[in-house]
Amino acid sequence: MEIIKNKEFGGERPLFASHDLRLENVIIHKGESALKECSNIEAYECVFEGKYPFWHVDKFKIERCLFKEGARAALWYSRDLLMKDTMVEAPKMFREMINLELENVRIPFAQETLWHCHNVRIRKMDLEKADYLFMHSSDIDIKDYRQQGNYSFQYCKNVTISDADIDSKDAFWGTENITVMNSKLIGEYLGWHSKNLKLINCHIGGTQPLCYAKDLILENCTFDEDADLAFEYSSVVADIKGKITSVKNPRSGRIVADEIGEIIIDKNIKLPANCEIIQRKK
């Protein structure tokens, strides 16, 4: 493997079509497509300032690097990435990618990140300003994860999340086969139009959670006081610890909670309209 150390590059495609290359303490200045159409690339303690540095790359490792704000849309149309101990200050990272492993990565401006990505493994990640995160992605395994940003995980499939703190309006809309464990989910309109969403040992906050859901399961979950008007038009099996402020027109299934402040069943309920609702303290 060729090694380039302590160098600086800029302009258009300075390392285009490189193969079997390791970069150490390299700075990629303003320009475009520094490492486009490359394979078997390693970057260690490098700084990326220019746009689109890693497009159409096959097999690459990025460790202890910095992507500055100008390095937007840095990793697209690529596969087989391992990224560790890296700071990303640019938006629109990771698009149309396969086989990503991200460990100890921080993205403080993560808008429109991780779209159309498949087979993703994340361990220890912190994202802020992360609106429209994980759109149309699948086969995702996440642990030790912090996120602030709305409209996340929309239209995702086959996702497992544990030990997460997610602050997101409209999270998990239109998803299929999602399991979230030991996590905090704060944000209104959680999980609408989802299929096979399973929440285990989770805390839920925000108005009108989990409506229009199909085959929804909750095990040993808790609700904030503002998580009212839950389960409207959902088929649900839920075991809730503590109180739910209100439940409205669930379609079918079984809801068990210590206490429910208000149960709203009105003329607008949809068939089969046979959900069993049980309060342990009554």
What are these regions (language model features)?
Residues M1-K282:
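Long, distal/terminal scaffolding or interaction modules
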